[in-house]
Amino acid sequence: MAEDRGTRLWQFPDHVYLNFTAMHGIQHVVDRISSLAEESVTPAERPPLSWFEAVARADSPDEVPPRELPFRVYLITGNAGSGKSTCIQALTEMLNCVTTGSTRVAALNVFTKLSSAYTSPAIQTIFHDFGFKGSHVQAVLGKFKYPKQPDPKSLVDAQMSDLYYYWDVLKDIANKVVEGGLPETMRVLLSLELKSGKPFTDAAPFLSAATPALIRSNVVLIDEAGVLGKHILTAVVFSWWLHNALWQTRRYAEGKVPVIVCIGSPTQTDAMESVFEHSTLRHLVSNKTNILSHLIRSSEMAERMNLNRNWTIFINNKRCTEQDFGNVLKAFEFGLPMNEGHARFLDQFVVSESYIKDPSKLPGWTRLFASHDDVKVYMSRLHANLRARRSDKFKVFVLPIYTVVSLEAFDKYKELTGQTSLTMEKWLTANASRLGNYSQSRDLDVTTPRFEYGTADGKKFALITTDASHVLNSQISVTKRVKKLVFGFEGSFGDFAAVLSEDTFFKKHGEDHVEFAYRFIAALLFSGMIAFYDFLRTEGLPQDKVDAAYSRLQAVTADLLAATHEQLGIAAAAGAQTGSGARRSRNADAFAFDDDASEEVTDAELDDLFGAMTDNSMDAFYLNYEKLPADAHGQEIFFHFDMLKRLFSERYDALSGLFGKTFTSAPFRTFVGQASFNGSNAFVSSFSGGILSFTSQTDAYTLRGVTRAPVPCFVDELFRGRDWAAAILRETDMPRVVVSDSMGFVSVINHNMSTFVDNVSGEELQMAATVDHGISSNLAMTITRSQGLGLDRVAICFATSQLKLNTAYVAMSRVTSCRYLRMNVNPLRTHYEDTRRVSAHILAALRCKDVKLVY
């Protein structure tokens, strides 16, 4: 329905179909962002490339003439679980936009949402897309101060103030972009565009891998923008104009302005900034105004960005559906007055702090703590408790962490900081949290470090070893996207049947080369067929049903192999006529004995062989099937997969009909090679036939142990570009972690490697390289880390000092049901700090007729 009595009610773009239930709420957001993306500025207002070249040449921001970098902004805010992620999915489907996340976890959450509906490219962080590099992590922020008091009504002053603050990073980005120049591919496209008048430059992202993401569109989506300082907004706008000016894009020529779509909750998050003070070896952590609060609370900025028309608020917590609990969360989110009714409702969840910190209580619950130190203390207590219980299933074992420190760089560091008496032990204690590439390294229960000193290739080094405790069969997360090799499956027959009936595995692992995914599952099916016969040897099964099961298994196997052999025989004959029968003939031989070979078999061997074949308890499948050849490809792989899948399904139906849940819930284990587990040690004969993939920081894994079996595809990969530490780290011979994912697939994970480069007085020092396993426990975590997660059971231990209401809101809103919430205190009955200053502006927006609301 496009028209009704002359009034347009709906518009549906031809290029997309949306869920009708989502269309009404999202359509106006799409319309408004599309309208903003069409706005343009005059050539005089458009920042020229020469201005960015001046930034690249300048030694300080004082040398750069002030100018405005035009942009537009659109806000999408709402309480936890209100549907903001669904909105991102709709916008990505309907608009040509650059979709990003503020953090790696936020980006992965967006990717998970998008890839659940269709094939999605990887989603990067906004830092990655605007040009932030690892070398910028140690940049000194705020080294330059804007020389005058910024006029709140002046966008130029606001942006130049951010430029001064973020100078080292933005200057380096500009310098690298300008030095790199315009690629030859783009020069050719520009030439073609000038000659033909057709938009050839729009094809640049598809022709050059080095094409910056920000030239693809002038609409940039940032999820979880509430954790970013306001200077990042200027950095994104700066980078968009820089890249588009250099690449001479059509949007730049037309004066189109970037539209930054900021998504998140300003009441949940803080923008934190950490600065390391070398003179005192201390971390200085401070709160910064985040992007969302900056735009909402600054009346001048809100007016300049016409925020009333460019803001949508999502309401209602769809994650937690209990009405009373939802009302309390709304009061936290929107700054409503907290009354005695709210406090009484939360009283029911309060238990003693000692109860929450007792590892023997609330098994399987996730503990949330205020600090990394609290997490570490709890994990140490948990490990001690498990060691005392001597549990075989939840056994505590240790994994090594190695750090190599360059003594030459360490001596230089002492010289530059004026700390000539600084010891390696003191330096390590102060920098432990900076050496790794993830904050959860501070949560680990580790031993006292051990120091070894040596020389390699003429360079002196210190090798520091610590052991981190982990719990076998516990839930963990990975802290970085690293390679994994999937080599098996552990679960139940029902679990594997569900994998075969769905396409989740093939969507996740078969986007680039679906043949690999089919070959891998075919290998698991081949190895796992014997499991049906193993199940029938389970003690306590009714003998009459066991006998019937053997007969049915033999019948379905014989029928399917006969039908398959006949089909392949026909195909082989047809192939012989067309000259392509060699491979088909080999396929036909895969399901029958070789007649020529039978002449070499003795009578005694034939008696044994045929005697076995008449025994129903022997699996005739393995006597009549040859494993898929290594050089098979294309249709041949799919044919074998399809045949094995049908055989598994028919066997599954036969046994589930006889034994019901006893069978479907029975263990099913299969691997591409031989694999066995003894405590925390996994013994694997071969990884050949496994499928290569990547871990995800948003996925939960079960820790199955470690293996020292060589993984050929991982060899030396981590040591590329780290020549000074490579020889030392190779000698450590670290084991690799084995995990299983939520679907039951078992993988071996590559090591996590990080290089620590420190910046002292403008000089970069290659200080250290650390290799560990990059995993952290899901049994306990900080409240900050839990943000964005939906957890089943949560026990919160708030800090005893003054509690911030936004911290309490983040922690409590993690649960999917308030029945599984416990807290050491009621936040409303403590001396809390009301950090919801932005809420008054949100309440005013709710009353504004121009601000859009989505329920």
UniProtKB/Swiss-Prot annotation:
GO molecular function terms listed in the Swiss-Prot or TrEMBL record: ATP binding; helicase activity; hydrolase activity
Record-linked InterPro entries: DNA_helicase_dom, HSV_HELI, P-loop_NTPase
Any single GO CC term annotated in Swiss-Prot or TrEMBL for this entry: host cell nucleus
Main location: host cell
Cell compartment(s), UniProt: Host nucleus
Residues reported in the UniProt entry to bind ATP: G78, N79, A80, G81, S82, G83, K84, S85
Record has Disulfide bond as a keyword: no
SUPFAM superfamilies per the UniProt record, alphabetical: P-loop containing nucleoside triphosphate hydrolases
Database matches in Gene3D superfamilies: P-loop containing nucleotide triphosphate hydrolases (3.40.50.300)
Entry's Gene Ontology BP terms: DNA replication
Superkingdom, natural source: Viruses
Subunit structure: Associates with the primase and the primase-associated factor to form the helicase-primase complex.
Record's function text: Component of the helicase/primase complex. Unwinds the DNA at the replication forks and generates single-stranded DNA for both leading and lagging strand synthesis. The primase synthesizes short RNA primers on the lagging strand that the polymerase elongates using dNTPs. Possesses helicase-like motifs and therefore may act as the helicase subunit of the complex.
Record family assignment: Belongs to the herpesviridae helicase family.
Annotated protein name in UniProt: DNA replication helicase
